[in-house]
Amino acid sequence: MLERIKGCFTESIQTQIAAAEALPDAISCAAMALVQSLLNGNKILCCGNGTSAANAQHFAASMINRFETERPSLPAIALNADNVVLTAITNDRLHDEVYAKQVRALGQAGDVLLAISTRGNSRDIVKAVEAAVTRDMTIVALTGYDGGELAGLLGQLDVEIRIPSHRGARVQELHMLTVNCLCDLIDNTLFPHQND
């Protein structure tokens, strides 16, 4: 059992090292897209399922409240956080549309959709991205494995941050770290002297 525990830590560290080599440019581009949207008076919509939903909510909470330092609130909405809306849509047997309907209702040109999917194949996330495209929104996709269907939907101005792993747990761990990096970059770009 102890060796298995050490193996989990070792694999996580190795994935973090691989991500540190592969992802800085993509994370930087994503942060700049998010910052530019906020500077233009737009908002960030985010969504995910399971652990990805928790990461989406963490991102939105860090924007609305704060990340590590006090600063003005920033507009972000976790589309998976409103149980009444979610159950109303799924009650009508529209499971695949649970986020797309919200994107069509709330999304505007210039907004960003932060779509988080471990494999990139969740139908409701794919439909949300398709809806965001019709609204002229920028998409930041956090994926893993081979990027899945999401990777094929992204345009030139969109950003995919694909965790270099084929293990769901490692992808999810690095998604959380990536969300924290994005929050840190947004805060330090928009409010560079808040930490002084």
Swiss-Prot record:
Gene3D superfamilies referenced in this protein's UniProt entry, alphabetically: Glucose-6-phosphate isomerase like protein, domain 1
Q: Which GO terms describe its biological process?
A: carbohydrate derivative metabolic process; DNA replication; positive regulation of DNA-templated DNA replication initiation
Gene Ontology terms, MF aspect: carbohydrate derivative binding
Listed A to Z, the keywords are: DNA replication
A Pfam short name: SIS_2
Q: Which residues form the SIS domain?
A: 34-196
A cellular component annotation (GO) from this entry: DnaA-DiaA complex
Q: Where is the signal peptide?
A: none
HAMAP family registered for this protein in UniProt:
SIS_DiaA (MF_01157)
By sequence similarity, the record places it as follows:
Belongs to the SIS family. DiaA subfamily.
Q: State what this protein does.
A: Required for the timely initiation of chromosomal replication via direct interactions with the DnaA initiator protein.
Subunit field text: Homotetramer; dimer of dimers.
Query: By what name is this protein known?
Result: DnaA initiator-associating protein DiaA
List the taxonomic lineage. Answer: Bacteria, Pseudomonadati, Pseudomonadota, Gammaproteobacteria, Enterobacterales
Q: Which gene encodes it?
A: diaA
